[in-house]
């Protein structure tokens, strides 16, 4: 069996490719079933975020398993394999384990150390378990990866003051507005007419950071206006005017800065819509939705500047130098956790031999106990029988304790295999004809 991961991320694919591979929560169950339908795939889990799609699997054969996963990704995205493959990465065994732990720790994020990825890995684990697509191996790996993410954040300063996608989006707005004014600094957003489209978690974070950067008033547009109103209640210090999606156009026309973060799988704003507004003022769009909420053709409008998640790199790179130093410490913790998992996984090789040995000894125990009890006669009470039974079980457990502990202990694969062969030979656990 082999652990593999196949996927793509902000490091390997631009947003126009990533958005075609975004798997929304409501499609996870169907996707997991499709992956489990491949005979090579034993366990599988999907991590889908705005910056990555990664499929982790336990497969019988690594090459066939990886090919099956790539086939699924190509079919799902509608991108022919030849165009898709250059954007895909594959990690196997130890490298796959290390990658997931680094992802969970925020070490592979666009925004180094960001915290949201940890909750996304938790969700991946939960969805895999709910759909019964994961088993003992991936469940153990996912659980330990989540623990690793928590450990990195509690034992290092990587998560301290870490920026998120939302905060980077707000900083990008500050930077671009400042550059228009001749500054290379982050300016206040106090004078901007701000519109936020969407009322989910990312929009909540956007409003939090907008408030911190000088915004005291904004318009919040959402398809479900009740959800927008509920979000606005949590920000009593900001004047938030809530509107339905049917009022989006008129509110774009009176705004200078628009943030979009909705779950729409198709753009909700395109050039045709903007041209109908007859804009005569400069307008900036910052779209952190994946799939994108704003069509790429909007950039062709003379008064519009549009940015997406890939443009956040300009802001992120300004903050990364300090975090890179802390990341070294975090990487050493991740490596420790990787070794712990691999030692546990390697020890599973001994389980069939241990189970066979225990089963054979249990059979002997029962046979010999039955012989002894049959000689004790009717005067031997039920209580005494229970005592003798417990005694024989205790003896077997004591005999097994040391060899089982040794077989499961950390050691090289060669050492463990040699020990297993000795045990199999000494206790006749294998058919000699099959071994010859």
Swiss-Prot record:
- Gene3D superfamilies reported in the protein's UniProt record: Glutamyl-tRNA reductase, N-terminal domain (3.30.460.30), NAD(P)-binding Rossmann-like Domain (3.40.50.720)
Site entry: Important for activity: 99
Question: Looking at the keywords, is Oxidoreductase present?
Answer: yes
First and last residue of the signal peptide: none
Q: EC top class, in one word?
A: oxidoreductase
EC assignment: 1.2.1.70
Q: Which residues bind NADP(+)?
A: 198-203
Q: Does the keyword NADP apply?
A: yes
Q: Assembly state and interactors? A: Homodimer.
HAMAP family in the cross-refs:
Glu_tRNA_reductase (MF_00087)
Give the protein's recorded name.
Glutamyl-tRNA reductase
What's the name of its gene?
A: hemA
